[in-house]
A protein has these predicted regions:
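Catalytic cores of nucleic-acid ligases and guanylyltransferases
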Residues: 1-349
Length: 349
């Protein structure tokens, strides 16, 4: 590729905050706010017929999204490097929202399955930062310039490649934070208008949804190292049925060993194999887990649900010895009002 930036480029990252940062009371705005898309981060490199979808880890995702490669060649300029997110929207119950499950399924080794899924669940690309266009490297330009150049180069986009909405009004961003969750989005991102693009640096600010739930401990998995517990498996009651909803992980080495010793008395026999479909927390390569007696309740922090399951891995907060497992049901969960992805792209208008 003959582009101003060589493949790969590490994406600029975001640090977490609890609230949307406010604009100064006097003087011009310093922040630009955007919806936080919940997909696969990707930097698109296009040089004519050559297209690379660079992941956050530096891998090329192009083979998993052939329909997106063709869309990029049809809809984006001949020579461009643009940072953004790969998403899969799907219509459900009369509205279109982001579908993390369908997106996750796209990372598959079989070319035949990739082709089938490209037709069944086509992906879209949401661009939010222009790093280069033509022979110009724009990473040293302020974000306000890069944003304007992105709109000049791409327009609002479509039908498969879009530019994300943006505003400098913090009140609008706070409204987006609440409304757009119903379309499967993850929160809001704030960027300094005068900020240059700094790969692998946490220069942006992300504000994500945060919730807690009391869940039933139904089992655990051993850590991939073979030492201690890797994840705790969580369940909620749906009437009389106890359903697995996801897992909690990210324990220290010491805590993994402590948990294994603590839960050994609750163990019910040998490993079992989950007999449902593989998910992001239950891959096809690792479906064995150890069931335990239904006695313990865990309070966890989570962000969103995907149908009846956690969208992402939860974070362990504490044991709840005061709770009866039978009291842990779906009715405790907050359900956002549904919202359509097309309206998010249009800026909530």
């Amino acid at each position: 590729m003959d582009l101003p930036l060589a493949v790969p480029v590490a994406p600029m990252l975001a640090k977490a905050a609890k609230v949307v940062p406010a604009q100064p009371e006097d003087g011009p705005a310093v922040w630009s706010y955007e919806p936080k898309w919940d997909g696969f981060r990707a930097i698109v490199f296009r040089d004519g017929d050559e297209v690379v979808l660079g992941s956050r880890g530096g891998k090329d995702l192009a083979r998993y999204f052939p329909e997106l490669v063709e869309a990029i060649k049809a809809e984006l300029p001949e020579k461009i490097v643009v940072d953004g997110e790969i998403v899969v929207p799907r219509e459900k119950n009369g509205s279109t929202r982001l579908d993390w499950e369908s997106l996750s399924e796209r990372i598959h080794p079989a070319a035949s399955r990739v082709t089938m899924l490209a037709e069944k669940t086509p992906a879209q690309f949401i661009g939010f930062d222009l790093l280069a266009v033509g022979d110009e490297d724009l990473t040293a330009e302020p974000f306000s310039t890069r944003r304007a150049r992105l709109l000049d180069a791409v327009g609002t986009g479509g039908p498969s490649c879009f530019v994300t909405s943006a505003t400098d009004d913090a009140a609008v961003a706070e409204d987006w934070f609440e409304r757009f969750e119903g379309a499967g989005l993850d929160g809001v991102v704030a960027k300094k208008l005068d900020g240059i693009y700094l790969p692998n640096k946490r220069e942006m600010v992300k504000i994500k949804h945060a919730r807690t739930a009391d869940c039933v401990l139904i089992g655990y998995r051993i850590h991939k190292s073979g030492n201690g517990i890797g994840s705790l498996l969580l369940g909620l009651y749906d009437g009389d049925d106890l359903r697995m909803i996801g897992g909690a992980s990210a324990f220290t080495d010491k805590r993994r060993l402590e948990l294994l010793e603590e839960l050994e008395p609750l163990r019910l026999g040998d490993d079992v194999t989950y007999d449902g479909e593989a998910t992001r927390w239950n891959s096809s390569n690792d479906r064995n887990w150890i069931p335990v007696r239904i006695e313990r309740v865990i309070e966890v922090a989570y962000d969103q649900m995907e149908g009846a399951r956690l969208r992402h891995v939860a974070r362990f907060l504490r044991w709840r010895p005061d709770r009866d497992p039978r009291s842990c049901a779906y009715d405790q969960l907050e359900v956002p009002v549904r919202y359509d992805v097309a309206d998010v792209i249009a800026g909530g208008r």
